[in-house]
Amino acid sequence: MAAGLCACNDEYTFVPEYEVKLPTDTTINVTIDASTVYQTIDGFASSDAWDMEYVGKYWSTSNKEAIAKLLFSREVDDKGNSQGIGLSMWRFNLGGGSEEQGDASGIVSDKKERRVDCFLTSANGSYDWSKSAGRRYFMEKAKEYGCESFVLFSNTPPVYYTYNGQARSDKGAFSNLKTEHYGDFADFLATCAKHFVDEGYNITHISPINEPQYNW
């Protein structure tokens, strides 16, 4: 959902088409057996990867608010149409510092939206919580709309802790995290989680290894 919305540009106000056009003679029969249980779903989620940073930073306030409404609202209009999909979980990407590296990150320029900055500014443990402003905008909107659960996920450790100094492995199925920095990476995740908890976010999950060998 987020990816589809963010693929459009900011030259016009996005207006969703709520009413599905069906032939008048169409009949749809749906049978729901509430007694049959298949699984337990903890939440309905999406994430801010990848373009939400640019949308949150550079798009107009009206369009950003419209996107947030589509993602998080559970209200219905006077015709019974949902104002949004009512996400109950939001996944926030804890970047590793590839954005600060630019082309040196090894993430090619035509995929530069996949470069993500890092709250940790150096290996000595200093943090800059003003980073990822665009993605934090949507995280805040999720909270305002009543999103119950937030997941922090990481595609890479901070680049200070990796073998090749990048936010991607260049050796295929190979861990890029130096063994001597396992504890440092855990501290990074815990520090970020505590920060957002202190900011009023209900951090329910931490996913430290997300898509570890995706070739980007």
Positions of predicted regions on the chain:
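Proline-rich intrinsically disordered, low-complexity coils
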Residues: 16, 23, 157-158, 208, ...
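Boundary/junction segments of secreted and surface-exposed precursor proteins
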Residues: 25-34
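N-terminal catalytic cores of secreted or lumenal carbohydrate-active enzymes
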Residues: 33-203
